Amino acid sequence: MNPNQKIITIGSVSLGLVVLNILLHIVSITITVLVLPGNGNNGSCNGTVIREYNETVRIEKVTQWHNTNVIEYIERSESDHFMNNTEALCDAKGFAPFSKDNGIRIGSRGHVFVIREPFVSCSPTECRTFFLTQGSLLNDKHSNGTVKDRSPYRTLMSVEIGQSPNVYQARFEAVAWSATACHDGKKWMTIGVTGPDAKAVAVVHYGGIPTDVINSWAGDILRTQESSCTCIKGECYWVMTDGPANRQAQYRAFKAKQGKIIGQAEISFNGGHIEECSCYPNEGKVECVCRDNWTGTNRPVLVISPDLSYRVGYLCAGLPSDTPRGEDSQFTGSCTSPMGNQGYGVKGFGFRQGNDVWMGRTISRTSRSGFEILKVRNGWVQNSKEQIKRQVVVDNLNWSGYSGSFTLPVELTKRNCLVPCFWVEMIRGKPEEKTIWTSSSSIVMCGVDHEIADWSWHDGAILPFDIDKM
């Protein structure tokens, strides 16, 4: 065979293979489009399957175009039973760092929300950080004027604990300028307060769906805890205030089951003032340490039973824990009455440990700077000044802010008690710093069986930002 014949033969074979390959593809496409859809599904190219994994159950919506699958993951309920939460608090010798979001540092160059009032709450499988956004991002023109508490742009959103409040991982929860949230073991319940000052409305969401509402009953800035509500055996409790911030107001405790309000109680507290309660479950009851924005530099204490009966008074300890406050040496303490004559205040917390109490407070007596937590012997039941432990979380050279409580459920820890935890907000920007905005980050600590060294886990952002220099 001469060279020309070889070339012709090789070319003919190659062309034949190409034609055969094309014919096979045509047959494959014809079978896929015309034959397979007719096999019991009326020509539909879409299908839904359920696949069970060890860690959870996911519904996968599978859309098929010939050889391509597009899969959307749809979340299922985390559990089929309510959390008990009737255990006692674990004894804590100190508090170890759980998370720190560094949101403002990241937000100088990242897409991070302007926020205030962050708090933490836990389900049987995870803890989430909730926060009230201002409908704007750090280092953006819309951050101007965000020192304002209430606006139509504020929303409650959440991320997994430790994540910054960024636009890519945040989950919308409610329209709100005041809020609370908690998990009953099956689904998240969130309560977002929004609307005009005189006719604000609290919208209850359960599993992401609006299920009930509470209208303002006193017409004066209906508001709630700015920290976790408390669920016990499927029933969730929270506290609301309606009325003046600097004199007698009205207070109510609410109970809901699966997002529907099933009870409420008026809290009679003449001469006392309750706002922004920090609550946690303990031995089958809800224990709250709140803010007196009227006169007291000691904190109100509210203990709620499952039937909504309650005991209300003040934290007995002979050390004040609100800000501003006077000298420790000049404070005597009271279990029943407000002490001191310092108006205003800041959200705070405390934990009962038998008759003792862990109480958090700013280190500064006059401003929201620094943060420490003290353990006072018999401070829950007596006017004791006996400080038996102290731990510094933020030093007094750095700004702090609100603080609040939550617990780790036994489903998370596998212990037979509820781990006490707290968070500290670190406010940056206005009114203390020369910026056009106000925002915050947070540090979260949880109780452990060991003493923890003092340190300062402060915010650390370098201000001003570029937007502040324009």
Swiss-Prot record:
Classification via HAMAP family: INFV_NRAM
Q: What does this protein do?
A: Catalyzes the removal of terminal sialic acid residues from viral and cellular glycoconjugates. Cleaves off the terminal sialic acids on the glycosylated HA during virus budding to facilitate virus release. Additionally helps virus spread through the circulation by further removing sialic acids from the cell surface. These cleavages prevent self-aggregation and ensure the efficient spread of the progeny virus from cell to cell. Otherwise, infection would be limited to one round of replication.
Q: Which SUPFAM superfamilies match?
A: Sialidases
Q: What is its EC number?
A: 3.2.1.18
What are the entry keywords?
Calcium, Disulfide bond, Glycoprotein, Glycosidase, Host cell membrane, Host membrane, Hydrolase, Membrane, Metal-binding, Signal-anchor, Transmembrane, Transmembrane helix, Virion
Q: Name one GO cellular component term.
A: virion membrane
Give the free-text PTM comment from the record. Answer: N-glycosylated.
Where does this protein chiefly localize?
virion
Q: What is the lineage of its organism?
A: Viruses, Riboviria, Orthornavirae, Negarnaviricota, Polyploviricotina
Activity-regulation annotation: Inhibited by the neuraminidase inhibitors zanamivir (Relenza) and oseltamivir (Tamiflu). These drugs interfere with the release of progeny virus from infected cells and are effective against all influenza strains. Resistance to neuraminidase inhibitors is quite rare.
Intravirion domain ranges by topology: 1-14
Subunit structure, as described in the record: Homotetramer.
Q: What is this protein called?
A: Neuraminidase
Q: Reproduce the miscellaneous comment text.
A: The influenza A genome consist of 8 RNA segments. Genetic variation of hemagglutinin and/or neuraminidase genes results in the emergence of new influenza strains. The mechanism of variation can be the result of point mutations or the result of genetic reassortment between segments of two different strains.
Give the InterPro entries listed for this entry. Glyco_hydro_34, Sialidase_sf
* Source domain of life: Viruses
Region Head of neuraminidase, as annotated, extends over 89-470
Compartments where located: Virion membrane; Host apical cell membrane
